[in-house]
UniProtKB/Swiss-Prot annotation:
Monomer. The lineage of its organism: Bacteria, Pseudomonadati, Pseudomonadota, Gammaproteobacteria, Oceanospirillales. HAMAP family: tRNA_sel_U_synth. This is tRNA 2-selenouridine synthase. Involved in the post-transcriptional modification of the uridine at the wobble position (U34) of tRNA(Lys), tRNA(Glu) and tRNA(Gln). Catalyzes the conversion of 2-thiouridine (S2U-RNA) to 2-selenouridine (Se2U-RNA). Acts in a two-step process involving geranylation of 2-thiouridine (S2U) to S-geranyl-2-thiouridine (geS2U) and subsequent selenation of the latter derivative to 2-selenouridine (Se2U) in the tRNA chain.
Length: 361
């Protein structure tokens, strides 16, 4: 009986994916939504690879069948079967869509479940993702700019054609923007971006970013398009921006740390992150300004423990006014591009919606 297969473009349709590669391969990069349920673990894969080099494919297959047999084989088939029963539209893939995914298909079929595999595997799907990013770089892009705290990310998230670059990178793009949880690898970031761009087939709206978001690079072709794309600029008063920054960088950050690590460890980790972030901009602040902000930050931590997170505004306000705002205004002065629209958050959202509605279909 033939085993069904699908074109690699299916990687962009966000179907549940069973990645049967070894954990070490999965860690280097996977596709959004993929779950690693390997045919062989790292040690087994290594042993089979050595046998392949020494004695060829037949000997390697024979060794693999001996290593993954009996109870071990039954456990791995059971894991695939359990996933398939929860996700009947699941798809299997390995590195090249060859032997490992076909073996997994066959074993599952013997257990009464038929799932398709991706033709060409991870390698072909990655080529599709890269092609999608290249295609998106040739489509219309609108960039949302503005001072820190203008809720640019929320504006992008409110649009059907919005691509949340910081969300995919799990980083807010500044010294204070690191997410409490581990961020994706470069490959994982590109895969998530490619999958998102595949839904914005006529154009997209993104937030103004430098090439690097944390430790991740926006793919060059797409970033070059962003650099020359038309812009809109959100302008909001300081008190509004300050409240937004406190919510994003203090309240939400604290809830995430507390929920994942508990009260005591979460508090310690959050305080360490914010203290370290301030130290990273010490040279640009200058010694006197840094020491002043450090003292204000320490006082804010004390008030925070009493339930007063608003106390953080005492150090966030000068950080914005004396560091981030001047830096952004300098960048704005160097830009050769005029904004298509300048206004408050609501007017910029309306403009972006009108822009996306006017895209050629």
């Amino acid at each position: 009986m033939s085993l069904p297969h699908l074109a690699p473009e299916m990687a962009l349709l966000e179907r549940p994916l069973i990645d049967v590669r070894a954990p070490v391969e999965f860690a280097r990069g996977a596709l959004p939504g993929a779950v690693n349920l390997p045919l062989m673990d790292d040690a087994e894969r290594h042993a089979v690879g050595i046998r392949y080099k020494e004695a060829g494919q037949g000997a390697a297959i024979a060794l693999g069948e001996r290593l993954v047999d009996g109870d071990l084989k039954a456990r791995r088939v059971a894991a695939w079967r359990a996933f398939a029963e929860r996700h009947p539209d699941a798809v299997i893939y390995c590195f090249r869509g060859g032997l490992r995914s076909r073996i997994a298909q066959q074993w599952l079929q013997e257990a009464g479940i038929t799932l398709p595999r991706i033709q060409g595997g991870w390698k072909a799907m990655r080529q599709c993702v890269n092609a999608e990013i290249e295609a998106a770089a040739a489509r219309p892009v609108l960039v949302v700019a503005g001072l820190t705290g203008c809720a640019k990310t929320e504006l992008v998230q409110s649009l059907d054609v919005g691509i949340d670059l910081e969300g995919h990178a799990r980083h807010k793009g500044s010294a204070f923007g690191r997410h409490p949880l581990q961020g994706p690898s470069q490959i994982d970031f590109e895969h998530a971006l490619g999958a998102a761009l595949s839904h914005a087939t006529h154009g997209c709206v993104v937030e103004d970013e430098s090439r690097m978001i944390g430790q991740l690079d926006i793919p060059l072709s797409f970033w070059q398009t962003m650099e020359t794309a038309p812009r809109i600029r959100v302008e909001m008063p300081l008190d509004w921006r300050l409240e937004q920054i406190r919510k994003d960088y203090i309240d939400t950050l604290w809830r995430t740390y507390r929920d994942h690590y508990g009260e005591w460890l979460g508090w310690s980790l959050m305080r360490k992150q914010l203290s370290s972030a301030l130290k990273r901009v010490r040279k640009r602040l200058g010694s006197a300004r840094f020491q002043r902000l450090q003292r204000l930050q320490a006082l804010a931590f004390r008030e925070h423990q009493r339930g007063n997170t608003q106390a953080h505004e005492a150090w966030l306000a000068p950080l914005m006014l004396e560091y981030y705002d001047p830096m952004y205004r300098y960048q704005l002065e160097q830009s050769p591009y005029e904004a298509l629209h300048v206004g408050d958050w609501e007017s910029c959202l309306a403009f972006a919606r009108d822009w996306s509605a006017a895209l050629p279909r």
